Swiss-Prot record:
Its main location: Golgi. The gene is B3gnt5. It comes from the Eukaryota. It comes from Mus musculus (Mouse). This is Lactosylceramide 1,3-N-acetyl-beta-D-glucosaminyltransferase. It holds the Pfam family Galactosyl_T.
Amino acid sequence: MRLFVSRRVKRWKIFHFFVTCFILSFMVFWSPINNYIMSHMKSYSYRYLVNSYGFVNNSLSLKHSSVQPHYPYLINHREKCQAQDVLLLLFIKTAPENYGRRSAIRKTWGNENYVQSQLNANIKILFALGTPGPLKGKELQKRLIGEDQVYKDIIQQDFIDSFHNLTSKFLLQFSWANTFCPHAKFLMTADDDIFIHMPNLIEYLQGLEQIGVRDFWIGHVHRGGPPVRDKSSKYYVPYEMYKWPAYPDYTAGAAYVVSRDVAAKIYEASQTLNSSMYIDDVFMGLCANKVGILPQDHVFFSGEGKIPYHPCIYEKMMTSHGHLQDLQDLWIEATHPKVKNISKGFFGQIYCRLIKIVLLCRLTYRNSYPCWAAFA
């Protein structure tokens, strides 16, 4: 009996020890977790107000005496889409030194001739960039000029190409579209490490064109996101720049598409708001909020993560983010004819449904396609 009681006491002490350790750990780690959770809960609670009322826009509006900075073009192709029926005007945000990325895109999803001959669509693709920093010198600029003389697909304005000038690059894109290609049915902007399944995208946009879609803006939507107040983060936004606890809804800058009428409205709004907000996708959300445009979430536009590699995923994919070395291999695999046949028939549909559930419905956060994309 004593032995039994002794064991129970020992087990209770061990249990008490682990409970104490858990509580202490919880107390130590709860503060940053709590701050993160509370920050997002607070920002999401403000989301309706930020999206519905004009006080945010009023606080960011330019004074009548102020104008947006205007940078001259160093490289331009004003004739790129003149007198043509353009389905899609696609800007790729790139850095001067990223020649390898531009080259891979030209050989894969960014090949205009492929889209014209194989997909029966006229699209125009331009790489948008600023100037090399002072440390990179004139040599890189000379190489850019030489590259453009070969491919004729670069537009460049005279601002330093850097993270804090992303909004200047945003203004370059929408200004160019408004000035030189306002008749394009759709405008898309994408990073240079993105993969776009061009056959799927073109088929989707052609269907939308036929029904005359308007007020259209799709991508991977961030809802009620809070400004980052951590000074060590590159996304840090001081209160002086943006004092509200939540941003208007916006799409991830990795890739999004807007219709022609939205592109025109965004350009007009961009000329009235303070462009010191250097996070370009947030600035896009501010412009859209001013003109009453809300983004639509598309489950096959990825966030910051790569999609799982599998033909069942490729069947409906639109974009995937973070591709630096595998772009050409992925292009060959994702556009292979077998992809369109893999889910045919009853058993094909069941097979792909199960594969997508396994690949997309994971407990670990991937930031690519959501679980419900497996059922789309």
